[in-house]
Swiss-Prot record:
<dbReference type="InterPro" id="IPR003593">
    <property type="entry name" value="AAA+_ATPase"/>
</dbReference>
<keyword id="KW-0479">Metal-binding</keyword>
<keyword id="KW-0547">Nucleotide-binding</keyword>
<feature type="region of interest" description="Lon-protease-like">
    <location>
        <begin position="350"/>
        <end position="453"/>
    </location>
</feature>
<keyword id="KW-0863">Zinc-finger</keyword>
<feature type="zinc finger region" description="C4-type">
    <location>
        <begin position="10"/>
        <end position="27"/>
    </location>
</feature>
<keyword id="KW-0238">DNA-binding</keyword>
<feature type="short sequence motif" description="RadA KNRFG motif">
    <location>
        <begin position="251"/>
        <end position="255"/>
    </location>
</feature>
<dbReference type="GO" id="GO:0005829">
    <property type="term" value="C:cytosol"/>
</dbReference>
<dbReference type="GO" id="GO:0003684">
    <property type="term" value="F:damaged DNA binding"/>
</dbReference>
<comment type="similarity">
    <text>Belongs to the RecA family. RadA subfamily.</text>
</comment>
<dbReference type="GO" id="GO:0005524">
    <property type="term" value="F:ATP binding"/>
</dbReference>
<dbReference type="Pfam" id="PF13541">
    <property type="entry name" value="ChlI"/>
</dbReference>
<dbReference type="GO" id="GO:0140664">
    <property type="term" value="F:ATP-dependent DNA damage sensor activity"/>
</dbReference>
<dbReference type="InterPro" id="IPR014721">
    <property type="entry name" value="Ribsml_uS5_D2-typ_fold_subgr"/>
</dbReference>
<keyword id="KW-0227">DNA damage</keyword>
<keyword id="KW-0862">Zinc</keyword>
């Protein structure tokens, strides 16, 4: 016998309450509670992911199955997934509206259709609209099926009929299950539809991609458990006024996290950027003050990026500090060290810092480049265009070691840099390539004296 239970659920964070609340005690959102009646079947349970019947087995007796990853024609996309698409995996892709999530998945789908059957389910566009959008992407294989539907029961039926190898859901907020009360995109609908898709993906070995909307704070909309249910969480990000897009993995059960893939939006769709370091530095001005280059690591990939700074006397009572692509607290810490340990009077100076090209820099190794960029703008002295900077800055002004120092130096040498300032205690036992000088430093003051003297 079915039991009905009425619950009020916050549509912003998924907090549940037995009664209506004007303000959510969890996320402080106003007027976000919606009543949802969930019908629970007492006797029947969800089918096990292993099949109709599942029994405990010893770990040593489990067959060691080596999954064959399916490669797309985009090496950047394969890199983020950990080497390709794993059969039966559930992949969630989020991003701002208009950033190119549907375009990315449509391109990936056309490539996967050459290696298996693809079912593309859209709840936001008709089949004719998707066909019109796909014409600029090139030829499409016959094993590419379009299905404009929002009913989960109908989608399940077509999955059982077509038996696809790859399934794309665009988007999860538009799909609804008739067994669950609540409107499309509600917390209960998103949770139950995702659970059903997970069961279909695991039992039928279907690699499933799910598009998810994001909130105004930039996080994935819907219940937080959505990210826990899936195997991989990808964020597709970038400035809407820039052509570059970054695909970032924040969770991956089948590969490394913090890997990124870089794409450029063009008239024919997304084009992968195979040498992002050269792209990010090609517009750098020689002789400009307030600029420094750092070799940052994005997963296993070294990328050269430019840190820009503009330091100018303030006209306000309190100096302004603005950052784009850099952590505000990290910049404030570095400016305090420069003022205390290096004698730079920055308390009456406005400071504006950004990472050129729209890439986000958040690892400790960027500290030294940020400090040099600030000092360059403050002193009105440019850095050499062939110099790069590596190192974390401590509160006493010391330069601390960073990871993968040899890989970073090799990347700088590959792009023609002739000098790299790096932590002295991190240079022992590494092979330095020819044509580049590595200067071991111990304090920020030592670096500023060497660069600007």
């Amino acid at each position: 016998m079915a039991k009905k239970k009425a619950t009020f659920i916050c549509q912003e964070c998924g907090y549940q309450s037995p009664k209506y609340l004007g303000r959510c005690p969890n996320c402080s959102a106003w007027s976000s509670f919606v009543e949802e009646v969930e019908v629970k079947e007492v006797k029947n349970a969800r089918v096990s992911l292993a099949g109709e019947k599942s029994r405990p087995v010893k770990l040593k007796d489990v067959d060691n199955i080596s999954y064959h990853r399916t490669q797309t024609d985009m090496s950047e996309f394969n890199r983020v997934l950990g080497g390709g698409v794993v059969p039966g995996s559930l992949i969630l892709i989020g991003g701002d509206p208009g950033i190119g999530k549907s375009t990315l998945l449509l391109q990936v789908s056309t490539q996967l259709a050459n290696k298996g059957t693809v079912l593309y389910v859209s709840g936001e566009e008709s089949a004719e609209q998707i066909k019109l959008r796909s014409e600029r992407l090139g030829d499409i294989d016959n094993e590419f099926y379009l299905y404009a539907e929002t009913n989960m029961q109908a989608i399940r039926t077509e999955i059982e009929n077509i038996k696809p190898d790859f399934l794309i859901i665009d988007s999860i907020q538009t799909i609804m299950s008739p067994d669950i009360t609540g409107v499309q995109g509600s917390v209960s609908q998103v949770r139950e539809v995702t659970a059903e898709l997970m069961q279909l993906a695991k039992t039928n070995n279907i690699a499933t991609f799910i598009v998810g909307h994001v909130t105004k704070e930039g996080t994935l909309a819907g219940p937080r458990m959505l990210e826990h249910m899936v195997d991989t969480v990808l964020y597709f990000e970038g400035e809407r006024h820039h052509t570059f897009r970054i695909l970032r993995a924040v969770k991956n059960r089948f590969g490394s996290t913090n890997e990124i893939g870089i794409f450029e939006m063009q008239s024919g769709g997304l084009v992968e950027v195979l040498n992002p370091s050269q792209v990010f530095l090609e517009e750098r001005l020689d002789g400009a003050t307030g600029s420094a280059v750092v070799v940052t690591m994005e997963g296993s990939r070294p990328i050269l990026a430019e840190v820009q700074s503009l330091v100018t006397p303030t006209v306000f009572g309190n100096a302004r500090r603005t950052t784009t692509g850099l952590d505000f607290n990290r910049v404030s810490l570095i400016m305090a060290v420069l003022e205390k340990r290096c004698g730079l009077l920055l308390q009456n100076q406005d400071a504006y810092l950004k990472s050129a090209g729209g890439v986000k820099l958040d690892e400790p190794a960027i500290d030294l480049a940020v400090a040099v960029a600030i000092a360059s703008s403050y002193k009105e002295k440019p850095t050499s265009p062939q110099e790069a900077f590596l190192g974390e800055i401590g509160l006493t002004g010391e330069i601390r070691r960073v990871t993968r120092i040899e890989q970073r130096i090799n990347e700088a040498a590959k792009l023609g840099f002739t000098k790299v300032y790096a932590p002295k205690n991190a240079l022992q036992g590494i092979d330095i390539p020819q044509g580049i000088e590595v200067v071991g430093v111990t304090t920020v003051g030592q670096v500023l004296k060497a660069v600007f003297s």
